[in-house]
C-alpha cells in the first residue's frame, strides 16, 4: 500500500507588493507646498524648516523652495525647504 501525501500542498508562494517608500525629492530640487519629499516607515528623517510630517511619517513641503538635507543634534537627519528669493517676492 503506497503511503504518499497528495502533491500541491505547499505553504509558500505568497508575497506582498513593495510599498514605494523612499526619497521622492532630492537635495537641490525645487518643490511647492504639498509636494511629498520622503515616504518612510518611522522617523528615519525628521522635518526641518518648512517641512511637515503626516501621520504615516511622510515628509512634505509646507512652502515653495529648494530641498536641503542636513544633520542635526544627536546624529539625526533633517530635511528642510529653503525659501528662494524669487519665491518670496
UniProtKB/Swiss-Prot annotation:
One of its GO terms (biological process) is translation. InterPro entries: Ribosomal_bL27 (IPR001684), Ribosomal_bL27_CS (IPR018261). One of its GO terms (cellular component) is cytosolic large ribosomal subunit. Gene3D superfamilies: 2.40.50.100. Pfam families: Ribosomal_L27. Belongs to the bacterial ribosomal protein bL27 family. This is Large ribosomal subunit protein bL27.
